[in-house]
UniProtKB/Swiss-Prot annotation:
ZnF locations on chain (FYVE-type): 63-105
Annotated tissue distribution: Detected in the pancreatic islet, in particular in insulin-positive beta cells, and in pituitary.
The organism's taxonomic lineage, starting at the top: Eukaryota, Metazoa, Chordata, Craniata, Vertebrata
SMART domains named among the record's database cross-references: C2
Protein name, as recorded: Synaptotagmin-like protein 4
Amino acid sequence: MSEILDLSFLSEMERDLILGVLQRDEELRKADEKRIRRLKNELLEIKRKGAKRGSQHYSDRTCARCQEGLGRLIPKSSTCVGCNHLVCRECRVLESNGSWRCKVCSKEIELKKATGDWFYDQKVNRFDYRTGSEIIRMSLRQKPAVNKRETAGQSLLQQTQMGDIWPGRRIIQEQQQREQSVLFEVPKTRSGKSALEAESESLDSYTADSDSTSRRDSLDKSGLFPEWKKMSAPKSQVEKEIPPGNQNAVCGDEGDMVFKKNTKKVLRPSEYTKSVIDLRPEDVAQESGILGDRSKSVPGLSVDMEEEEEEEEDIDHLVKLHRQKLARGSMQSGSSMSTLGSIMSIYSEAGDFGNISVTGKIAFSLKFEQKTQTLVIHVKECHQLAYADEAKKRSNPYVKTYLLPDKSRQGKRKTSIKRDTINPLYDETFRYEISESLLAQRTLQFSVWHHGRFGRNTFLGEAEVHMDSWKLDKKLDHCLPLHGKISTESSPGLPAHKGELVVSLKYIPASKLPVGGDRKKSKGGEGGELQVWIKEAKNLTAAKSGGTSDSFVKGYLLPMRNKASKRKTPVMKKTLSPHYNHTFVYNGVRLEDLQHMCLELTVWDREPLASNDFLGGVRLGVGTGISNGEVVDWMDSTGEEVSLWQKMRQYPGSWAEGTLQLRSSMVKQKLGV
């Protein structure tokens, strides 16, 4: 019974679907068995025709298959290499290599190939013959076990017993003992249960405890309406808090990084036509109140608040997060640890550059091919770069280029690494496919980095070329001096246009909500409904190599930043002006609460096998920098963002529409207050 799977979490509809698949599998299996029987019958028929009968007399010089005479002179080549019988020319079957076999031997080989007997002959000696469909069918027949509450002592005891036997070693022992024809029994633990059963119960108790803890945390943190003061906690306390059930949990302090994989995938409710999830405390308790991670490519956002992307993490992501955490801890302690370099595009901009005095120049040439609408960049060499390791007089420089404001993964080009030199010679060519009109709005950035150990790269300098000042019909050969980092605020010449987002807002008071609908009572009274209609985006930044983006919009109603407050539109593929036409709905919102709230909308490019790329964002709120009497970074709305939010509050029950410029960074903006 150790092979039985725990399928108690499946619903009735899912069980029916699986049984339907198993039924089709059984039909295909029967059809294949019928084909094999037909081939075996053909082989038996050939053998029957060549069988010698006792009523007849046969000579020694007859064909072993058709019993015809072979004559007096029989050459040695008339013997079959498979069965060593004499065979006439009519009963031979030529093979691809020029040799031949008799009909019976040839048919037997064909039968083994067609039926897979050559594999199953060895499989029977090594494995128990039990198909996956049989195991699933047996598991579905088994009744789900009753959920029993276990004590912490029982859970720890079972985990200790489970750790005594490594699963990989157990499998090796099983295979070795089967080969020696020794009956193998699953080792029993001290509680009288098999190790696999103990492991299963231990896992169940862990997930049950994790689920109950996450529900308690969600109740504590979800007092958004109207009691937010309970959820305001010191930043250090929030950073030390470990969200239970989170896919990547960080245990201990920032220096001691231990990642755990979530052992239980939370089953999501069925999809709605609108993103409707009630935010009242009694409903939030049913959600997983987990503070998620935000996506890795947002400039200016805390690593601790980066959002988990639907259980899609892999080991590369964990390593990146580990390195980012180490670098952030280094900056907080005031040390001069090197930056993360090219681990990710955005995080190349992070780090402490005060310990490196930027020197040197970079030589390059530019050419624009009108026929193919391609910018060709020839990175030639660098002169007199700074030493990344002053003590050892060592630098391993490489050059990275971007067409700003696009700092996506697809927009990055990188040279090879030249080791132990401050005068590297590259002679490498990069190409950007971009139209002439769009190129005039970009700025070409060269940045030079030292490649250090463990991915800790050091910034050595950068230079920019404003493409609107260059005549594209002429080839440009230039040698620019390198300089230190220039912030976006101190360099207004750098283009920061990320596109526009068209949204409509409407607040419906509780008195105007339909009776019997989503209208529910919260502790502070009845709450209304906030509707956010995401209509379209215009002129987004191209994140894909073909000059397009697969974009979607993600929303949070701050100060609550968890899955209960998260909304997402569908992904619009291969367009820079997508029409989303999707509505976010937040229930249980009171009109007076809107003074202390902020709606954050961010646009992302979808990357299936990696972290998503940030394309821009907006924050809609009153823009005072204060929420519920406390200074917060996210209440930084300006201009049209404030006007649209105030218009929505001023006219309840009516749509307020606006076109908002997307921010290039979600760092706190300077407020004119």
